[in-house]
């Protein structure tokens, strides 16, 4: 309650507020209903200008001692039922976070729906661009390949003439026989460097051509790779097992009709000095010679005649006409006996082969 100060002055601003006990609810209601009169809790009248006089500064003259439930300043009072909810910081933060997540989910779902609405058209556009790019790359590649193929120099096709060489042929650079019959030199099929020096030269033109085969169940070879291996095997066997200085024959003919150089034009073969030995690569007691193989031998003979390596009237004989052997095989023998230069020496009552040259039986098995 308010009490008047004992100071002799009567200034209305010198009032002090002393502590009082907490009023009961009934007393508070009575105070509210009697708000029309300005009295203190003790029934003493308050000065009328205590709240309206600007000269009065209660903050400088009011002392609070052992008081409770004191309000200084404006206060709002509610009459009627009021519901007050208390929410601590954690609950408020959780609700705000949940609201944010829901908002984000709503935005995300909206964006996803919009993306799903737009993604098919984007996917179609992307696939179309990729397809067009791929087609353009394929077309460009095809055009480049076509251009390269059209501008690649074409190899000269061999002629189908019987003889393909002029008189200026150099035997040290053996040419292609034409018509697909290649000549594979010693360096090309990988001749061994361990061969011993050959000492018996061939005198040209050569009067006899001797036809042999490899035999011993040898399979015909049909490409340069396989035939080159076979040539090296024959040479190794001749040097290591038979004690010969080099491979036996002058030339070898494969199934595809290619010519492989053995001792060549300059050196005598291992059979007889005055002969040019041509060997069919395979066992022709078991296999038939192919048409390209037979043609390759004929082309080689035509080339040799044109260049005077063999006599114009050369005599063609099979090895079994000169000694007891199955070479060159029954199938080859059936073919060559019908060739124009075949010579039937050593058969039935015919004279021995080479007798006109002074050759004896031993001359056809020189092993040199």
UniProtKB/Swiss-Prot annotation:
Membrane topology, Cytoplasmic segments: 1-127
Biological role: Peptidoglycan-recognition protein probably involved in innate immunity by binding to peptidoglycans (PGN) of bacteria and activating the immune response.
The organism of origin for this protein: Drosophila melanogaster (Fruit fly)
Assigned protein family: Belongs to the N-acetylmuramoyl-L-alanine amidase 2 family.
Protein name (record): Peptidoglycan-recognition protein LA
Entry-linked Gene3D superfamilies: Peptidoglycan recognition protein-like
Record-annotated disulphide pairs: 221-227
Region (Disordered): 21-46, 101-122
InterPro entries linked: Amidase/PGRP_sf (IPR036505), Amidase_domain (IPR002502), PGRP (IPR015510), PGRP_domain_met/bac (IPR006619)
Domain spans labelled N-acetylmuramoyl-L-alanine amidase: 233-320
GO molecular function annotation: zinc ion binding
TM region(s), chain numbering: 128-148
Low complexity bias (residue ranges): 33-43, 102-113
Glycosylation (residues): 273, 320
Cellular component annotations (GO), alphabetically ordered: plasma membrane
Biological process according to GO: defense response to Gram-negative bacterium; immune response; innate immune response; positive regulation of peptidoglycan recognition protein signaling pathway; response to bacterium
SUPFAM superfamilies xref list: N-acetylmuramoyl-L-alanine amidase-like
């Amino acid at each position: 309650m308010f009490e008047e100060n004992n100071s002799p002055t009567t200034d209305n601003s010198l009032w002090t507020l002393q502590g009082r006990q907490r009023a009961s609810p009934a007393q508070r209601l009575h105070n509210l209903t009697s708000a029309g009169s300005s009295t203190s809790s003790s029934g003493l009248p308050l000065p009328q200008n205590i709240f309206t006089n600007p000269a009065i500064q209660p903050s400088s003259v009011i002392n609070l001692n052992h008081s409770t439930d004191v309000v200084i300043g404006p206060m709002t009072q509610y009459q009627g039922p009021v519901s007050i909810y208390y929410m601590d910081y954690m609950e408020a933060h959780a609700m705000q976070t949940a609201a944010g997540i829901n908002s984000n989910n709503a935005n995300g779902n909206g964006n996803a729906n919009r993306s799903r609405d737009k993604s098919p058209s984007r996917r179609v556009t992307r696939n179309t661009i990729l397809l067009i790019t791929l087609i353009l790359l394929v077309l460009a590649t095809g055009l480049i390949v076509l251009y390269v193929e059209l501008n690649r120099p074409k190899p000269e096709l061999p002629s189908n003439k019987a003889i393909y060489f002029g008189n200026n042929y150099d035997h040290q650079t053996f040419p292609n026989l034409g018509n697909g019959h290649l000549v594979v030199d010693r360096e090309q099929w990988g001749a061994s460097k361990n061969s011993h020096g050959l000492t018996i030269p061939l005198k040209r033109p050569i009067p006899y051509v001797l036809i042999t085969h490899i035999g011993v169940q040898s399979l015909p070879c049909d490409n340069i790779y396989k035939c080159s291996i076979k040539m090296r095997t024959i040479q190794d066997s001749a040097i290591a097992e038979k004690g010969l200085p080099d491979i036996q024959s002058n030339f070898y003919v494969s199934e595809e009709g290619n010519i492989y150089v053995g001792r060549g034009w300059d050196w005598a073969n291992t059979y007889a000095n005055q002969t040019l030995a041509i060997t069919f690569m395979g066992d022709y007691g078991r296999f038939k010679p192919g048409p390209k193989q037979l043609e390759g031998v004929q082309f080689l003979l035509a080339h040799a005649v044109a260049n005077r390596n063999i006599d114009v009237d050369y005599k063609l004989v099979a090895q079994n006409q000169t000694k007891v052997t199955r070479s060159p095989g029954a199938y080859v023998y059936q073919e060559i006996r019908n060739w124009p230069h075949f010579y039937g020496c050593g058969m039935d009552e015919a004279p021995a082969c080479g007798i006109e040259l002074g050759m004896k039986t031993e001359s056809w098995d020189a092993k040199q």
